[in-house]
Each structure stands twice: as C-alpha cells, then as structure tokens.
Amino acid sequence: MSCCKMEAPYPHAESDEKRIVFALDPKGDDAERDQYRLQLIPGRVLEMSRNDAANHQTLSGSIEQHTVEGWGAPFFHVKLAKEAAATLMQVHSEDHVEKSRKFVALSNTPLVPYTSRYPVVVYLPKDAELRYSIWCGGEQMQATTE
C-alpha cells in the first residue's frame, strides 16, 4: 500500500462512531479515473442461529460521500440499521440453539471513485466493520447495432 499523508482537516468521529483510514496504491491518474473503482462494504458481525445464518442477511443503511471544504478530499459517512433483514427459508430442522457469527453487509454498496491522492476516510458506527473491494475494468468496448 502507498503512504499518503492525512493533511486535510478531516472531522473527528462522533462519540458513537469510529473513523477508519487507509491508503490505496497509486495506479496513475488516467487508470484511476477510467478503470478503477472502490467498493466500501460496511456491516456488522452478528450472532444468529444456524438456520438464520444459512439465509441471506442484509442491513439497510446508506453511504454518503462528503468533501473536506477547501481541500477537495473525499470522506464517507456510513449509517447502518441495528437489525438485519433476512430471507426466511427453513434450512435446518433442529431447535436453533447452536449459534454462529456472520458478517452481514449493507444491502447496497455503491462503487465510488478510486483515488490514491487522498486516504480513504470512513466514519461508521463503533460496532460496525468495514471491508472493501477494488474493481478494475479493461478497455472500453463499443457495442454495435444489428
């Protein structure tokens, strides 16, 4: 990973939040603009029965992008629901006593611009985790009509 300096005056985390900061590897301005995207995947590790864990779980919430005034440095603010929504398939017939822990992600995780000029700064609830993916596309292709 690259080491970009955190020079912009990012806000402090609120008392019920934490701030996560990490750097992205430089890919070149053109490639970062045209080919790369960052997907922030916030969520929580929840304890649930084996039956619930076998179902698809999601959290509602949002990711809002903001900019440090006068700097142009982006940062993100995550809001997450406390309770997960889930499919309701009965998978195991036993009594649901056995518990497991499972990462449950925000249901809609948009792709945001990739930039190595500034650190990625994300504010999220203290009990949440942040995972991320980096997406890379190839050359643009032209669709043709028949």
From Swiss-Prot:
* Origin superkingdom: Eukaryota
| A molecular function GO annotation | serine-type endopeptidase inhibitor activity
Q: Which family does the UniProt entry place this protein in?
A: Belongs to the protease inhibitor I11 (ecotin) family.
Name the UniProt record assigns to this protein: Ecotin-like protein 1
